[in-house]
């Protein structure tokens, strides 16, 4: 019997609608208003730390622009038309995704410029998503500038960056900037709890707090930690599991260690995981 391969949580629960973008309420509200008022710019710049949803947001924008079955008065992509499905998978012929970290030169950008004159093959807009755009060379930015100044009507650019200060002001002045923030701890914990519920699992509150602290507001990092913990978990995630995975000491063990130090006792009295974490 064929068994479907395991899909990591970050991919399994990647947002498919704007309403699923966790902790980015201001961003979602602004994007909704721009679509509803038909004031969608030709270039977006998504700025935020790693793992907060920049790539997911870029694909949502691409889907909203090219969805063929959106309901009247709604900005949410249908996720059922061929455009939505292929964009979600990163396979749409008219949505070109490029890694600015590996393609930094002027020739890479010139390849894009040479193709913008051609209309989309199967969608309304041809969309270029450039991740880590701050890694482009100065000559590459200069080559891109002319197209951003006078873009074809059928072309949209979506840039993503973790380092806004490295992007030239001439580029920043020609894009609509959106800032994605790191998630508040309570919001992230609630999100993790919901995912565990859908997976038929549960977790100690302290375990989720530990994951949230380690992830520091990054959804992707939190789900990556959760994936690793689930390898050794049957039904309920305990904080001890998380601490052992991360090589950390729990609060109770920290207090116990302080007591041992005060009393001048040997480390032989503490657990092996704790001893490994502090030595």
What residue spans do the PLM features occupy?
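P-loop/Walker A NTP-binding region and its immediately flanking N-terminal helices
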Residues: 1-177
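Extended, largely alpha-helical regulatory/partner-binding modules appended to the mid-to-C-terminal parts
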Residues: 89-93, 111, 124, 160, ...
């Amino acid at each position: 019997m064929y068994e479907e391969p395991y899909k990591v949580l970050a991919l399994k629960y990647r947002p498919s609608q704007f309403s699923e973008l966790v902790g980015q309420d201001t961003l979602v509200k602004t994007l909704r208003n721009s679509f509803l008022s038909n004031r969608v710019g030709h270039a977006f710049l998504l700025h935020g730390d790693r793992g907060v949803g920049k790539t997911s947001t870029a694909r949502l924008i691409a889907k909203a622009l090219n969805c063929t079955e959106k309901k009247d008065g709604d900005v949410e992509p249908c996720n059922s038309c061929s455009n939505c499905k292929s964009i979600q998978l990163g396979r749409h012929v008219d949505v070109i995704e490029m890694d600015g970290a590996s393609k930094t030169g002027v020739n890479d950008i010139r390849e894009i410029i040479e193709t913008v004159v051609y209309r989309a093959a199967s969608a309304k807009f041809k969309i270029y998503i450039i991740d880590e755009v701050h890694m482009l060379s100065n000559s590459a930015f200069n080559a891109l500038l002319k197209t951003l100044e006078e873009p074809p009507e059928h072309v949209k650019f979506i840039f993503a960056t973790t380092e806004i200060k490295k992007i030239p002001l001439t580029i920043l002045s020609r894009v609509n900037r959106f800032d994605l923030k790191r998630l508040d701890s309570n919001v992230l914990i609630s999100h993790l709890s919901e995912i565990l519920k859908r997976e038929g699992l549960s977790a100690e509150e302290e375990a989720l707090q530990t994951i949230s602290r380690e992830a520091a507001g990054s959804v992707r990092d939190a789900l990556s930690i959760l994936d690793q913990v689930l390898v050794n978990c049957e039904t309920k995630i305990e904080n001890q599991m998380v601490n052992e995975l991360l090589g950390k000491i729990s609060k109770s063990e920290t207090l116990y260690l302080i007591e041992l130090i005060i009393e001048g006792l040997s480390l032989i009295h503490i657990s092996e995981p704790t001893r490994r974490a502090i030595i």
